[in-house]
C-alpha cells in the first residue's frame, strides 16, 4: 500500500528505529526490496534518482514502482532522491513519486534555503513532503580526500534552516559519503546530537552502505530516522551475477532478486523497522 513518509519518519523518530530507503532502478532490485519488506512486515521507501536514468527510463519504470507499492502488503513510499532542480522533482511527482528530496546542498546557506523553500511552497499544498540537505554529502571519491574538504552540517544553522524552509525532514552530513568507502567511515556523532536537539523534524543519513552495524545503531539511538542504502544492494547483486554467470539468464535474474532481498532484509532488521507494519 502507498504510505505517507511523514507518518513513518515521525514514528521512527519517536520509537527509536529507522525506516530503510533503497534506491532501485530495475525490476530485480524493486522486487527484491518489496519481497524483503513484506517478509519483515516493515514499511519501506523505494527511490529513484537522476544517476540511474542512463540505465532505466524513469517515466516508464515509475509505473512499476507505483503499481508494486500499491499492491504491497506493507506500507511503501515512492521517493525521488537528490532532486537538484524543480523541473526534476516536478517530473518525479507527475510520475507518481509521493515523497521528494530537493537537494540544494551544493549551494551556500541562503541559496539552499531559497531553493528548498521554493520546492516546499509548491509541493506542500499538493500534500507532498520535501526532504532537504544541510551540509553536503559528496559522491564516491577517495574518502580521505573527501574528509579533508568535507562540509559538515552546521548545528548552529539547522534550526534556522528548518524554520525558514519548512522542510519535512533533514539529511545531515556527518562524515558520510555516497558510494564505496575507501577507508573506515569516521562519523561525527556530536553533529547528530546537536542537530537533533536543535530541530523537531526527522533526520536522514545518506551514504550508509559500508557503515558499520555499531555506527548505524548509534546513529539511530541519537535520532536518525531514515537511512539510505544503494551500493550494498548493487554489491549483493554483483556477487549473485558472478556466482551464476554460467546459468541461464532467467535463473540469474531470480538469483539477483534473491540476493537483493537478503541484503535488504539484513538492513531492515538492523534498522529495527521489522514488525512495525504488523
Swiss-Prot record:
GO biological process terms, semicolon-separated: carbohydrate metabolic process; protein homotetramerization
GO cellular component: cytosol
InterPro entries, sorted: Aldolase_TIM (IPR013785), Class_II_FBP_aldolase (IPR050246), FBA_II (IPR000771)
Highest taxon of source: Bacteria
Gene Ontology molecular function terms on file: aldehyde-lyase activity; identical protein binding; tagatose-bisphosphate aldolase activity; zinc ion binding
NCBIfam families per the UniProt record, alphabetical: cbbA
Protein name: Uncharacterized protein YdjI
Gene: ydjI
